[in-house]
Amino acid sequence: MGMRMMFTMFLLVVLATTVVSINLDHAFDGRNAAANNKATDLMARTVRRFCSDPPCRISNPESCGWEP
Protein backbone atom coordinates (compact mmCIF):
# COMPACT_ATOMS: atom_id res chain seq x y z
CA MET A 1 0.00 0.00 0.00
CA GLY A 2 1.18 3.45 -0.79
CA MET A 3 1.60 6.23 1.71
CA ARG A 4 -1.47 8.05 0.41
CA MET A 5 -3.65 4.93 0.80
CA MET A 6 -2.42 4.38 4.38
CA PHE A 7 -3.18 7.99 5.26
CA THR A 8 -6.69 7.65 3.77
CA MET A 9 -7.34 4.49 5.81
CA PHE A 10 -6.12 6.28 8.94
CA LEU A 11 -8.53 9.16 8.34
CA LEU A 12 -11.44 6.75 7.79
CA VAL A 13 -10.71 4.95 11.07
CA VAL A 14 -10.50 8.25 12.96
CA LEU A 15 -13.77 9.47 11.43
CA ALA A 16 -15.59 6.20 12.20
CA THR A 17 -14.34 6.23 15.80
CA THR A 18 -15.47 9.82 16.27
CA VAL A 19 -18.97 9.15 14.90
CA VAL A 20 -19.44 6.10 17.14
CA SER A 21 -18.16 8.02 20.16
CA ILE A 22 -20.55 10.94 19.57
CA ASN A 23 -23.54 8.60 19.21
CA LEU A 24 -22.66 6.78 22.42
CA ASP A 25 -22.37 10.09 24.29
CA HIS A 26 -25.88 11.11 23.20
CA ALA A 27 -27.32 7.78 24.33
CA PHE A 28 -25.52 8.08 27.65
CA ASP A 29 -26.89 11.61 28.17
CA GLY A 30 -30.41 10.30 27.59
CA ARG A 31 -29.98 7.66 30.28
CA ASN A 32 -28.62 10.29 32.66
CA ALA A 33 -31.62 12.54 32.02
CA ALA A 34 -34.02 9.71 32.79
CA ALA A 35 -32.18 8.93 36.03
CA ASN A 36 -32.18 12.61 37.01
CA ASN A 37 -35.93 12.83 36.44
CA LYS A 38 -36.51 9.81 38.68
CA ALA A 39 -34.31 11.31 41.40
CA THR A 40 -36.12 14.65 41.15
CA ASP A 41 -39.52 12.95 41.49
CA LEU A 42 -38.31 11.00 44.51
CA MET A 43 -36.98 14.15 46.15
CA ALA A 44 -40.25 16.01 45.53
CA ARG A 45 -42.27 13.18 47.09
CA THR A 46 -39.94 13.11 50.10
CA VAL A 47 -40.26 16.88 50.63
CA ARG A 48 -44.06 16.68 50.36
CA ARG A 49 -44.13 13.95 53.00
CA PHE A 50 -41.69 15.90 55.16
CA CYS A 51 -43.72 19.12 54.88
CA SER A 52 -46.99 17.36 55.65
CA ASP A 53 -45.65 16.44 59.11
CA PRO A 54 -46.39 19.44 61.41
CA PRO A 55 -43.34 19.11 63.71
CA CYS A 56 -41.00 18.89 60.72
CA ARG A 57 -42.73 21.78 58.95
CA ILE A 58 -42.46 24.01 62.03
CA SER A 59 -38.81 23.20 62.69
CA ASN A 60 -37.80 23.66 59.00
CA PRO A 61 -40.01 26.38 57.47
CA GLU A 62 -37.45 27.36 54.79
CA SER A 63 -37.59 23.85 53.31
CA CYS A 64 -41.38 23.90 53.09
CA GLY A 65 -41.64 27.34 51.51
CA TRP A 66 -43.21 29.32 54.33
CA GLU A 67 -42.08 31.43 57.26
CA PRO A 68 -43.73 31.13 60.70
UniProtKB/Swiss-Prot annotation:
Tissue: Expressed by the venom duct.
Cystine connections: C51-C64
Subcellular location: Secreted
Residue stretch(es) of the prosequence: 22-49
Secreted keyword on record: yes
Keyword list, A-Z: Acetylcholine receptor inhibiting toxin, Disulfide bond, Ion channel impairing toxin, Neurotoxin, Postsynaptic neurotoxin, Secreted, Signal, Toxin
Signal peptide: 1-21
Residue spans crossing the bilayer: none
GO cellular component terms given for this protein: extracellular region; host cell postsynaptic membrane
Keyword Cell membrane: no
Note from the entry: The mature peptide contains 3 cysteine residues.
Known role: Alpha-conotoxins act on postsynaptic membranes, they bind to the nicotinic acetylcholine receptors (nAChR) and thus inhibit them.
UniProt similarity note: Belongs to the conotoxin A superfamily.
Protein name: Putative alpha-conotoxin Qc alphaL-1
Taxonomic placement: Eukaryota, Metazoa, Spiralia, Lophotrochozoa, Mollusca
